[in-house]
């Protein structure tokens, strides 16, 4: 690969081999004027540019010699009228005007009518050759047709926000020294701050440029997209030009005028999306020309602080701080912090005292080179918690729901807010409140004291609101697109929990996905395989109605692969597919006689009950299996008229995969459980099962944890039976669904896909749920569906699927090392649900939900294990975190007023030199201390 990084190597190369285009390599001698111009506007100190440098190849194909001639005579940031330029260039007005218009259209120059220098009292139009960054780099990348025709300008932009800064960033003082951009906080976050000054507020700048605003394309989003590192945001209209710059972007067809209210609406939408406000920072305290709404995954300006680990390049005068007592470790601030300054930790004291959390090293007293940089900042900033861990409930939940958060809101009687918080990760809380396997409760720290908090029952109470059209919660859409929704069509194949979760989060993001379901109604296994006495179908319908309200289309009775193919859907305009067809059928009972007429898959049995109303059973029923499906099958058999029901499983009684609740429900209904037995043979009479022989199971797994049951063949138990219902595995039925695609399969029949993105070998096809993981629970499928939505959004927008992606990895705090002062917590015993005896052994749910009084008592039992922790050394004071917290637990404080000192770029050394001298003194003192300590 040709060195495209200049004469000096950098540790952060632009990988040319990964680009979708070739960096130009001219076959002619370099043009000296372009070399001079490129060097002049970028000012890379100590570089003698060659044709291999970005300063040359970034301009060579766009800028003519005639343009370069004029630009070189203009000088950098020295405004001139056309009359002055006529004198300098010796050109006639008409050809010069035409050339200047072409240069402005291209983005090489700008113009304005201001008189800040006192040399333009009549406010004549003056032309300026700007710096490359911020300046012509943005202008060159603010027109999609230009980037498409000359993609090297995107690479030029990326290089010039890196190479000129490699050596200087550690020496930049607070305030940024007139270099690049400057973070300006969310205004609402500082509205009560008495010492806030005008230039720290968006409204101040908008009023300063009253009536002159224009929205325009984000050059960072557009250029990064061209480099194959897009973030999925729509690139249009995120950047707001103000003052004369608004006229420039409109007149050169880079933007359109907007009103004050429209500008404020864009800023609010940016905050909703977690974007950072930044103002230009090269003109001192009296002028800016743009306010950007920046996504850290693509922003070249934020990169200057994040990649070099030098926050002074960006930070505002404010620092976030958490009020620990209010914090509930919901993680919203963590997920949205652009700088990775907030992570989840714990409130609970340890036996060794309270945890002291580390702070990031800063360049103030340390020599700073590439070894100190944070090259992978976009991924590292998405680390969710400290190694010491956080709340076990959030960690254990596959969807990582903010359990501690919604318990707190419920305790305060804020049920709607609690429902909103749950649905950020789980669109089916009413469903899960009835069927979840409650891993959060298994992990609950309270369980080490007495009993776990009844988390799921509280969730069920909260989610009752979703069952009423008047009180259900329909989320506001948070769309990373300024004007309207996304138009790309996405198909969800399979209307189960994974598919519907994917559809929900795509709709929330601004899509109108279509769910294709082969059955007559959506819901998948929720509707057709979970008995209604556990999950009444009006509950599922109510939560599906929320999807309809969001704009999700359901096409039921359509089997993709049979009624319509993926190829045909592509012809209809579908750009992406999420395949979540589940495991629709049971496997075989692989023992002699296992194919007898009355040996039936438990899943097929339940589906027959729900889809075809097949409810007649006679005689003795034997259920084989120990999971939650086996419990459902056994209890359904009771309701279908079985004379008796017995359940046999390999595992010991305490190790049965079904939960304690399922086991007790079975026993309440007279189902006999025989734990530790495996099927040996089905004995038949006239082709039908009459008896089934079981042998004693001594162990289920080997030392490595692999399924390898060991039996005592001499210990046999016979079970007479009229019907055998086996629940020992499920399988996907693909048929012709994926015919003609490149999707590959695992030996067990599940689809192969990337474990992070769920993308298959066919790029536009993603998979999720049981069809990918094998048999799991509804909450696992729901979590996978949200990740599928994230991938599909990124994919159809042409973005990277992985960079800056939250991997949703959490660590459980060490409960054994937690110091819990039992006397300081509520000692009320765990609340219990009631039962409606009139509904016992019917197909209605006999469980009675908690009352409000029980919810209040139960939520008081939460120990409040987790909390967010801010590293002030990393915080850039953007205030995004404050917009996400529903508990007012994180606020901005004006602790760094020096960060609001703004310089003109021409005066940057006036700021840098004093700071550099002080820093060098600190470094030498630190080195002397280190040497002394070493002795």
What is the predicted role of each segment?
Residues 595-618, 702-775, 790:
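FAD-site-proximal beta/loop scaffold in flavoenzymes
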